[in-house]
Every structure is written in C-alpha cells, then in structure tokens.
Amino acid sequence: MTKMISLEEARELVLSRVTPLEAETVDLLDAAGRVAAADLKSDIDVSPFAHAAMDGYAVRRCDLAGATAESPITLEVIDEVPAGGVFEGTPQAGQCVRIMTGAALPGCFDAVVKYEIVSMVEGDGKPGGRVAFSAQPKERDNVREAGEEARAGEIVVNKGEVITTAGVGFLAGCGVLRVPVYR
C-alpha cells in the first residue's frame, strides 16, 4: 500500500528536484512577456509633482470661503496652463488660473475646480475673463499628488510576475531601464 505524505512534504520533495532558472538582465524594451527575477522598484516618484487631475481652475480655497449657489464668488482668470505646462506667476487674492489635466499645480493653489461646474461671468473662462464658483472645494480636490502612482523605492512589479507590455510602459515611467528576468 502507498504511504500518503503531507502537502508540505510533497512540496519539499518536488522543490528538492527542481533546478531554478538562471536570471539575466535585459533592456526594458526586451522584458515584455518575461518573468521578473527580482522585485522591481521605481527609481523616481511618479508623478514627480502635484498636478491637475482634470480640466478646471486652480484656486486657493480661502478665496472661495462662503461661496454658495445663492451667493457665488467671482474670481479673475489670470493665466491658462496647458497639460504638461507650469504656471510661473504670482496670483493675488481673487485670482485663479485655468488649468488642464496633467499640468503642474502651482504651489500657491490648493485645489482644482472642474470646468463643468463653474459659471462664466465675463469672457469665455480664459485669461482676462471672470468665473463664478458656487462652493468652496475640499482641500486638494481634483489634485493628484507627487508620488501618488508610485514612490521612489516602492516595489512596482513583484518577483515572479510576468512583465506585460503595460508593465513595460509603467516601468519606463518609473525610470527603470534594465530589469532582471528569468531565462
């Protein structure tokens, strides 16, 4: 009669007869479909800066304290920041900046109000115009913080995971250029 062994004993028996695959380091673009031979960590914070999570207006919450639908607060639009752009100015009280998704959030602002919920008062919402806000946004509303997707040193692909084409793109965004994979 055959003797039964425990699952742990069976596992140890199988593993004792397996030769681990060797690892090699390859260029990131050659890693798609390969298995990570080590935990892969981000080299940088992704995103490296706080940025607008959607199109809208970068505001200082203090400028909109007390804003309601019955008593909206109007701000002057002083600039427009495109995706990937940076605002270089210094706004005064009562001013805001039109900002696009992905643009760096100027440090003087603490929230982004969606374009769709703002009323145009003068102009078309672009620099030189005025827009009305019917509520004070929450702190950091519609803002993606620096490092929100990955922090420098954070594991972004675990050892033993298959590196997908999407994973290659994400690793590239994390500053990873070469990766250890199994042969």
Region roles according to the model:
Residues T2, L7, A58-R183:
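Short, glycine/charged-enriched hinge/interface segments at domain edges or termini
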Residues M1-S71, R98:
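Short, low-complexity N-terminal leaders and the immediately following helix N-cap/first helix
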